[in-house]
C-alpha cells in the first residue's frame, strides 16, 4: 500500500506523543496521559506500521518487544572499556584513596559527586544519530554480550535521545545499571513459586539473569528499570557538552534518561562521610537495593589527568557499607587442595542468608587463621560477606561452644594423595609438594585451559576430573596426545563431541608464547606478568637461562616473582614438561618478532610510543598492534623516555605533557607513513 503524506506525518506525531508519555510515566513518574488514551494511540500507530512496514523504525514504541527469540548472544567489544571500581569499606580507607590520587597531581581543590551504588547489572548503551543501536552487558569490561533486543524492553531507556539545545551530536555512549525494583522482584518470585520454579536469590541475580534471556518477551514481563550514570559523546568538544560529572548527569536527564535523584555534590570528604552515614540506614527505605556509594571527582579535567590503573579509574572509588553478618553453626571443616598444592581449610556451615544469598561455606584461609580464631567443629560463629562477595568467619561465640569440641589440626598429609605436606619458613600456607597429586594435576589443567591461558573451549571442571580420574592425562602435555578412542570412555562423549574437543586442543597450539607462559602456572606469575616476561625474553630458552637478578630488574616483576620463575625452571620435571609441549607444537617463542625478519628490518625497534585521543580510522588496539609488530613499545603514560606521541581527536593532558617535554607528535597519517 502506498503511503500518503498525511500518514507519514501521523506516524511521526504518534511516536512523539507516545515517547513523551513513556518518558513522563517511566522516568519522571508523573503520568501525562490516561492509560486508555495511550493504548488507543499505540494501536493506531501499530495499525499504520502494519499497513506501511517501510515506516517502521528502530526507535518506534512498537519495537520494544515482540522480536523473534535469539538463539545466542553475540560477543561485542566495548568502544570504551567498563572498568571496575576500587573498593573502600570505611571512611579511613576512603581517606587513604583521597591521599593516593592527590599524590598524582599538583595540589588542588576538588569537588566530589556522591551517587548511590545501585545493586543491579551494568550495561553499556550506544546511540548513533540519536537512535539506540546497541546494548551490551559489562562482561569482562572489554567485551560483553549484545543484548540490544532485551534492552529495548526497558521502558526507562529511550530508544531515541532528546537533543534540545545540543547541535551536531556524535556517537553517544551511556553506562548505567539495570535493576529490579524490590516490589517487582517480590512479585516475580511469587509467580515462580506458584509455577514450581526455582526462586531468584536476590534482585541482582534476577536482573542479570533477565538480561541474558534469549526471549525478549520474558524480559519485558520482568519489568526491569534503569539508572544512567556515565556519558561519553564522541565527535564533539567535551567542553561544549559537560565539564563535570554533575553536568553530565543533568545532560543525561535532558536526553531522556532516568538518573538516580539521590546524588549529591560534596565540597569535602567530611560531606561525603555524612552522605555515606545517612544512606547507611535510609537505603533500607528505598524501593531498590543498594550496596554502597560511588564517589567520583567532579572535574573531567582532573579525571583525565589522573587516568586509570590496570583495573580501576584513579578518580573514583566504591565506598561499600559494612558487610552483613549472621550467626551460624560450623558442621565440618574440610581441606581443599589447589593447583599450587596449597591446603585451604573451609568451614562447612548450616546455611544462612547473607545479603540476599544463601551461604553454607566460608574460607578459613590457613592454619594461622584457624589458631587465631580457635575455631572448632560445632562452634557457633559470626560469618559475613566481606565486600558483599566472599563469605568469611569473623569471630567465634565461645560462650556457646559445646563441651566436647576439639581444636582443629591441619593435616600432616595431603587429603587427596596422602603424601606428607610442608610449610615453608615464613609462609602461612601449608602445601602438598607431590607433583603427581590428583588435586594439583586437576587444578593445573583447569588453569591451562582457562580463558586467559590457552583458552581451550569445551574443557570444563567436570571433564578435567574425568580425564584425571580415568588416568587419561598425567600432565597438561597429555592433552595433546588424546585420541577419539580414549575420549569415548568418558560420560556424554560421542564421536562428534570427541572430535570437536580434539580440534579445540589442537587449535590451542597457535596461542602465543605469553599465554603459554601464563598457562604453565608458575607461582606469582599472572597474565600481566607473563606478558612482561615474554616481551623481555622472547623465547623459553632465554627465560630459562636468565639470571634471577636480571628477571627481577624487569619493571613490574620484582624479587619474589623472579625467584619463583628462576626456581621453576631449575626443576627437572618442569624441564621435561616444556620439552614435551615443544614437541607437541606449542609456541615457546614470539614468532612474529623472531622470524626471518631480523631487528634491522623492524623499523620501530627501541622506540617507545604513547597514544592519546581518538584516531580517524584506526582503533587504538589496531594502532598498538601495528607499532608492536614493527618492534615498537607501547606505554600508557608520557615521560622523558617516550619517543613519540600519536595524537588523535580529543587529546588531553598527555599532549600537554609531551609538548612540555619536547616529545615529537605524530598524526595517524604520519604513523602509517613511518610504518609503510
From Swiss-Prot:
Annotated keywords: DNA damage, DNA repair, DNA replication, Ligase, Magnesium, Manganese, Metal-binding, NAD, Zinc
Binding site for NAD(+): 35-39, 84-85, 115, 138, 177, 296, 320
Annotated catalysed reactions: NAD(+) + (deoxyribonucleotide)n-3'-hydroxyl + 5'-phospho-(deoxyribonucleotide)m = (deoxyribonucleotide)n+m + AMP + beta-nicotinamide D-nucleotide
Active-site feature positions: 117
Ranges for domain BRCT: 599-676
Alphabetical GO biological process terms: DNA repair; DNA replication
Domain of life: Bacteria
Signal peptide annotation: none
Cited CDD domains: LIGANc
GO molecular function annotation: DNA binding; DNA ligase (NAD+) activity; metal ion binding
Cofactor: Mg(2+); Mn(2+)
EC number: 6.5.1.2
Binding site for Zn(2+): 414, 417, 432, 437
Similarity annotation: Belongs to the NAD-dependent DNA ligase family. LigA subfamily.
NCBIfam families: dnlj (TIGR00575), PRK07956.1 (NF005932)
Annotated function: DNA ligase that catalyzes the formation of phosphodiester linkages between 5'-phosphoryl and 3'-hydroxyl groups in double-stranded DNA using NAD as a coenzyme and as the energy source for the reaction. It is essential for DNA replication and repair of damaged DNA.
This protein's name: DNA ligase
Amino acid at each position: 500500500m502506498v503511503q500518503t503524506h498525511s500518514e507519514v506525518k501521523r506516524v511521526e506525531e504518534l511516536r512523539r506523543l507516545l515517547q513523551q508519555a513513556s518518558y513522563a510515566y517511566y522516568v519522571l513518574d508523573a503520568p501525562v496521559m490516561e492509560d486508555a488514551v495511550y493504548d488507543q494511540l499505540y494501536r493506531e500507530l501499530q495499525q499504520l506500521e502494519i499497513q506501511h512496514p517501510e515506516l517502521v523504525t528502530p526507535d518506534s514504541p512498537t519495537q520494544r518487544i515482540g522480536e523473534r527469540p535469539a538463539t545466542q548472544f553475540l560477543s561485542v567489544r566495548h568502544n570504551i572499556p567498563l572498568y571496575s571500581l576500587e573498593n573502600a569499606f570505611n571512611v579511613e580507607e576512603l581517606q587513604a584513596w583521597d591521599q593516593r590520587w592527590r599524590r598524582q597531581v599538583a595540589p588542588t581543590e576538588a569537588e566530589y559527586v556522591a551517587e548511590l551504588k545501585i545493586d543491579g547489572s551494568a550495561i553499556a548503551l550506544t546511540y548513533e544519530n540519536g537512535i539506540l543501536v546497541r546494548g551490551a552487558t559489562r562482561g569482562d569490561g572489554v567485551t560483553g554480550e549484545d543484548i540490544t533486543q532485551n534492552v529495548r524492553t526497558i521502558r526507562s531507556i529511550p530508544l531515541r535521545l532528546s537533543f534540545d539545545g545540543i547541535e551536531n551530536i556524535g556517537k553517544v555512549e551511556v553506562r548505567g545499571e539495570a535493576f529490579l525494583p524490590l516490589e517487582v522482584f517480590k512479585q516475580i518470585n511469587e509467580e515462580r513459586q506458584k509455577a514450581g520454579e526455582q526462586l531468584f536469590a536476590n534482585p541482582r541475580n534476577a536482573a542479570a539473569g533477565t538480561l541474558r534471556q534469549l526471549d525478549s518477551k520474558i524480559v519485558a514481563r520482568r519489568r526491569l528499570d534503569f539508572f544512567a550514570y556515565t556519558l561519553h559523546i564522541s565527535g564533539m568538544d567535551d567542553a561544549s557538552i559537560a565539564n563535570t560529572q554533575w553536568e553530565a548527569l543533568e545532560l543525561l536527564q535532558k536526553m531522556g534518561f532516568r538518573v538516580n535523584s539521590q546524588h549529591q555534590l560534596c565540597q569535602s570528604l567530611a560531606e561525603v562521610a555524612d552522605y555515606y552515614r545517612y544512606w547507611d540506614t535510609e537505603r533500607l527505605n528505598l524501593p531498590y537495593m543498594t550496596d554502597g556509594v560511588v564517589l567520583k571527582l567532579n572535574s573531567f579535567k582532573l579525571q583525565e589527568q589522573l587516568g586509570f590503573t590496570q583495573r580501576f579509574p584513579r578518580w573514583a572509588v566504591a565506598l561499600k557499607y559494612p558487610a552483613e553478618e549472621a550467626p551460624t553453626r560450623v558442621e565440618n571443616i574440610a581441606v581443599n587442595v589447589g593447583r599450587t598444592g596449597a591446603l585451604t581449610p573451609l568451614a562447612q556451615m548450616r546455611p544462612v542468608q547473607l545479603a540476599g544469598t544463601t551461604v553454607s561455606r566460608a574460607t578459613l584461609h590457613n592454619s594461622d587463621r584457624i589458631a587465631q580464631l580457635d575455631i572448632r567443629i560445632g562452634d557457633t560463629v559470626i560469618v559475613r560477606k566481606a565486600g558483599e562477595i566472599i563469605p568469611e568467619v569473623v569471630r567465634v561465640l565461645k560462650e556457646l561452644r559445646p563441651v566436647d569440641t576439639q581444636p582443629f589440626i591441619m593435616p600432616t598429609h595431603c587429603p587427596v594423595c596422602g603424601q606428607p605436606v610442608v610449610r615453608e619458613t615464613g609462609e602461612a600456607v601449608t602445601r602438598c609438594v607431590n607433583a603427581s597429586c590428583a588435586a594439583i594435576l586437576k587444578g593445573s589443567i583447569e588453569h591451562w585451559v582457562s580463558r586467559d591461558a590457552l583458552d581451550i573451549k569445551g574443557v570444563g571442571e567436570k571433564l578435567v576430573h574425568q580425564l584425571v580420574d580415568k588416568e587419561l592425562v598425567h600432565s597438561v602435555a597429555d592433552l595433546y596426545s588424546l585420541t577419539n578412542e580414549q575420549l569415548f570412555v568418558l560420560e556424554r562423549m560421542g564421536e562428534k563431541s570427541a572430535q570437536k574437543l580434539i580440534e579445540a586442543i589442537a587449535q590451542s597450539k597457535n596461542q602465543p608464547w605469553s599465554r603459554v607462559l601464563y598457562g604453565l602456572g608458575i607461582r606469582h606469575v599472572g597474565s600481566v606478568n607473563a606478558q612482561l616476561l615474554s616481551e623481555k625474553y622472547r623465547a623459553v630458552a632465554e627465560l630459562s637461562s636468565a639470571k634471577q637478578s636480571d628477571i627481577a630488574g624487569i619493571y613490574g616483576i620484582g624479587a619474589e616473582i623472579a625467584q619463583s620463575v628462576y626456581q621453576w625452571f631449575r626443576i627437572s620435571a618442569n624441564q621435561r614438561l616444556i620439552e614435551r609441549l615443544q614437541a607437541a607444537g606449542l609456541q615457546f617463542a614470539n614468532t612474529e618478532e623472531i622470524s626471518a625478519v631480523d631487528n634491522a628490518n623492524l623499523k620501530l625497534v627501541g622506540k617507545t610510543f604513547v597514544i592519546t585521543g581518538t584516531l580517524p580510522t584506526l582503533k587504538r588496539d589496531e594502532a598498538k598492534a601495528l607499532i608492536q609488530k614493527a618492534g615498537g613499545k607501547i606505554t600508557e603514560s608520557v615521560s622523558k623516555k617516550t619517543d613519540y606521541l600519536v595524537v588523535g581527536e580529543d587529546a588531553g593532558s598527555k599532549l600537554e605533557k609531551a609538548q612540555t617535554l619536547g616529545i615529537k607528535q605524530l598524526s595517524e597519517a604520519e604513523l602509517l607513513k613511518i610504518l609503510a
